[in-house]
Amino acid sequence: MTPADLADAIVAAIGRAVADGDLDVTVPTTVTVERPKTAGHGDYASPVALQLAKAARRKPREVAEVLAGRLATQSGIASVDIAGPGFLNFTLAGDALGEIARTVVRAGESYGHAAKPRGVRVNLEFVSANPTGPVTLASARWAAVGDALARILTAAGFSVGGEYYVNDAGVQIERFGASVLAAAAGREIPAEGYHGAYVAEIAAAVLAGRPDLLDLPEDAALAVTTEEGLALMLTEIRSTLEGFGVHFDRWASERALHTAGALTKAIDDLRAQGHVYDADGAVWLRTTDFGDDKDRPLVKSDGQPTYFCADAAYYRDKRGRGFDQLIYLLGADHHGYVARLKAISACFGDDPATNLDVIIGQLVTLSRGGAPVKMSKRAGTFLTLHDLVDAVGVDAARYSLVRSSLDSSLDLDLDLVTRQTSDNPVFYVQYAHARISSLLRNAEALGLPTASETADVALLTHPREVDLLRGLGEFPRVIEAAASLRGPHRVARYLEELAGVYHRFYDACRVLPQGDEEAGPLTGARLLLVAATRVVLANGLGLLGVSAPERM
């Protein structure tokens, strides 16, 4: 019985108590189940009675007594005790904890995933870097975290659409085209333009396809370098991200919104709802009505739409495509966007608390030997995803970028993340999987079943076995927490803890017989436990987009 199973049993018991007239509360969809904070207080605990007491207009211990009576006879539960003000402490039946191993192996790749779809469509926008240069190190973090979050949300039962918003309209694109043209003509690139070897490479590629480029009038040549340079840069960005294992369901074009008249339609909708006004020759949105520090212009006095107007049109476009929740993963320099996006959501009649989630991430730096790594040879003034992958590989890069909370800055030690020692987290987790795979290959060579349906899991009573079983049982709740709190790092930290628990189990509990020993029932039970651990490690690494090697 996993914590998720126990939570379901508690919810069912609440439902029965309500149906019987013993409790007058709204039946929750889920409840908290955790390990007891004090040893000897059972296998799991729940504060559900304390949480329901106010709504039930009963003392917590009275609510606990109502639930304990219904749960004590539940299959897999040996006893239910009431502690303190009303905590429920559960002791599982002899084989109930061991059954977790069998549950994991039976479920395989689906273990930890939601049993059924939630019926909620989520749009997850991430990276969305300007297509004016290679994918930067900061964008690499959003790529790793965003892709992992998409996988985790999918596992948690959401229907997820990953999206890259291409900022292919505006001044920065004009400057990029001018920079490529200057490089092609052998002229000095404007100070406000884009610099670095990659600009010269793109210019050479454009020239190769258009040898007549420099014979064209300046405006025509600029149009060519802008369009073809943009296409080449986008091709490189796509290739880089695909090589990093990052998938997008849609590449959305800002320019396409302009062309389709989406900005005008957004303004019309907002005006019809009374949130738009005209002043000083410009068109404004009353964002201060919804928590912004000042109203924002949609159209400037020169008649040109603002970036904010495009943001509003893009929000409307996403909701119009049927997405229930919109998640924006933005960089540290976008703090000001939070209030603006919430105001946009509210102006369109949505509830920002329900329909919108803006996640702000902090920056990444690299170091080697204690010294900062400051510059890319190709990009010139900034580090790129390509630089990072070249230095450490895809697995180490993705894992290292994901394992820390986004709200903290990240300094990646290139020496550490390539070290094959236990102080390197990605090696530590991957090595646990490889170590298990080696053990299971040896078991198969001895003719031993590695996932026997008849294994006697009631024999798994050693403290290290119990710790490992409890750890495996936590995985579904870890996925749920990582999804609801938008924190893929929770999966990484869980895997590191699980790997440590496994290594301690391996050191304390011999799995395979040695010498002339005969394999007994305990061998089969431990092999099932080991196989279950491999499933969870592989599933968890897969959610982070990291491989689970069979050999290291």
Swiss-Prot record:
GO BP of this protein: arginyl-tRNA aminoacylation
Summary of subunit composition and partner proteins: Monomer.
Organism in which the protein naturally occurs: Frankia alni (strain DSM 45986 / CECT 9034 / ACN14a)
Enzyme Commission (EC) number: 6.1.1.19
GO cellular component terms, A-Z: cytoplasm
Primary gene name: argS
Motif 'HIGH' region, residue numbers: 129-139
Catalytic activity: tRNA(Arg) + L-arginine + ATP = L-arginyl-tRNA(Arg) + AMP + diphosphate
Record's protein name: Arginine--tRNA ligase
Classification via InterPro entries: Arg-tRNA-ligase, Arg-tRNA-synth_N, Arg-tRNA-synth_N_sf, ArgRS_core, DALR_anticod-bd, Rossmann-like_a/b/a_fold, tRNAsynth_Ia_anticodon-bd
Enzyme class: ligase
GO molecular function: arginine-tRNA ligase activity; ATP binding
